[in-house]
A protein has these predicted regions:
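Short, charged/polar connector segments at secondary-structure boundaries
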Residues: 1-104, 113-121
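Amphipathic alpha-helical extensions and coiled-coil-like segments
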Residues: 132-136, 154, 164-273
Length: 275
């Protein structure tokens, strides 16, 4: 591990090149040209040019960046942003050429934990963002030697106040294909349904998504559980999926759906193989 004195020497030498230096919480803040910055690899949080970004841009124009970002040396030159992607974008939109940052020489796992923890408490985070963020942090903590699946999951959710079980459910969502995960993001598919469907193979999920779009019916938790069971028993196909989705609500027993009705939801070329 590099000593603090060595870190200060390196940061100061960079400051000699670009000027402007101050100290925040004992760490040197340096102004870095924004064209030397690179996004964090597989950054799971979306940076939108929305109304909130407009407000941030106006604040940056008026007051500058009040909280420096955190970066680390990038292998090909420049710096990888660990914390501060929205501030970086705001600087671009505000027409600034530099951004104040703290440069840390940290490994991938440490950088991942910082990246997730500095974003996870935002109010407008999508389920998909949490899913991939929690998965990345979980894997990072495991690499760092965290023992036990349950204990690690609890550590992952500690910053955001999520239980270990909730973290595990979010991580399951990372196994969904993008089309189904989008439905979870827009609240058309509940998280519990998405979690159950995440156990299906990619091909099975594609069949479910096609059926959902054709029937315009979102699976209930009970239907998703039934679909999952069919998958575990190696019995899941298009016919089974349509049959389960078209079951009448609150029926005590299974309902037989006619081949003619099921076939009406398929393109002509696909009907023979399904019915």
């Amino acid at each position: 591990m590099r000593s603090k004195s060595a870190e200060k020497v390196k940061l100061s030498s960079f400051d000699d090149l670009f000027g402007k230096e101050e100290t925040v919480s004992g760490e040197v803040v340096t102004s870095v040209p924004i064209d030397l910055l690179h996004p964090f690899k597989n950054h799971p949080f979306h940076v939108q040019d929305d109304e909130k970004m407009e407000e941030t841009v106006e604040s940056v124009k008026q007051y500058g960046i009040l909280m420096p970002g955190i970066v680390r040396p990038y292998p090909d030159g420049g710096y990888e942003v660990v914390a501060g992607h929205r501030r970086w974008r705001a600087c671009e939109l505000a027409g600034l050429e530099e951004m104040p940052v703290i440069i840390r020489d940290i490994d991938d796992d440490t950088a991942t934990v910082i990246m997730v923890d500095t974003n996870i408490q935002r109010e407008d985070i999508l389920p998909s963002e949490k899913a991939f963020a929690y998965k990345m942090k979980y894997e990072a903590l495991k690499h760092q030697g965290s023992k036990g699946e349950k204990y690690t999951a609890e550590m992952v959710g500690e910053t955001a106040g999520d239980s270990g079980r909730t973290v595990q459910r979010y991580i399951r969502l990372a196994n969904l294909i993008s089309g189904l995960l989008d439905l979870v993001d827009v609240k058309k598919v509940p998280m519990i349904v998405g979690e159950k469907l995440s156990y299906l193979t990619r091909e099975e999920q594609e069949l479910v998504l096609e059926a959902v779009r054709n029937c315009e019916i979102m699976p209930t938790a009970a239907q998703a559980e039934a679909i999952k069971m069919f998958s575990e028993e190696k019995k899941l196909d298009g016919n089974a999926i349509y049959g389960l989705l078209l079951k009448k609500k609150n029926s005590g027993n299974g309902v037989t759906i006619s081949a003619k009705k099921i076939s009406s939801y398929f393109p002509p070329a696909d009907r023979k193989s399904v019915v």
